[in-house]
């Protein structure tokens, strides 16, 4: 599987994943967020622990799919822009993951902030 390393590291979830499952993945990956994709691995957005918390406070259930709370305005890069990742991390200290997209918004990879420089 082309994207198995992203799935294995709990950095990406299908849009039908429940809020509860997403929160478990975010806890496991220790990055505060996950990328969200459809069945064809087309990028749909990001879900952070903050989005989950706000959704639960506003009455969402843990069984609701993350497609209901996905942030479609998260920072992304195109394949030919990977070198800009460090600049984005410096400009946006709250960002821990940057999805790398190809033509048609297919998720190709995720750049992960160096944990030694993670926002505290």
Language-model features: where?
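Bateman (tandem CBS) regulatory domains
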Residues: 1-11, 64-74
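Short beta->alpha transition motifs characteristic of CBS
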Residues: 28-31, 35, 42-57, 99, ...
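Short beta-to-alpha loop/turn elements within the nucleotide-binding domains of ABC transporters
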Residues: 17, 47, 64
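The conserved cystathionine-beta-synthase
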Residues: 12-31, 37, 56, 75-95, ...
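Cysteine-rich, disulfide-stabilized extracellular repeat modules
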Residues: 9, 43, 62-65, 107
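Phosphate-coordinating loops and pocket residues in cytosolic domains that bind phosphorylated ligands
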Residues: 57-58, 71
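Short, flexible segments with low predicted structural confidence
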Residues: 24, 40-41, 61
């Amino acid at each position: 599987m082309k994207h198995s390393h992203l799935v294995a590291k709990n950095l990406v979830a299908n849009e039908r994943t429940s809020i509860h499952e997403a929160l478990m993945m975010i806890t496991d990956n220790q990055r505060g967020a996950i990328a969200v994709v459809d069945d064809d691995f087309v990028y749909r957005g990001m879900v952070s622990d903050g989005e989950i918390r706000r959704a639960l406070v506003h009455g969402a259930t843990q069984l609701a799919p993350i497609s209901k709370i996905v942030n479609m305005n998260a920072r992304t890069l195109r394949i030919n822009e990977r070198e800009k990742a460090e600049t984005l991390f410096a400009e946006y200290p709250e960002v821990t993951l940057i999805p790398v997209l190809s033509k048609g918004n297919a998720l190709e990879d995720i750049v992960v902030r160096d944990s030694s420089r993670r926002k505290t």
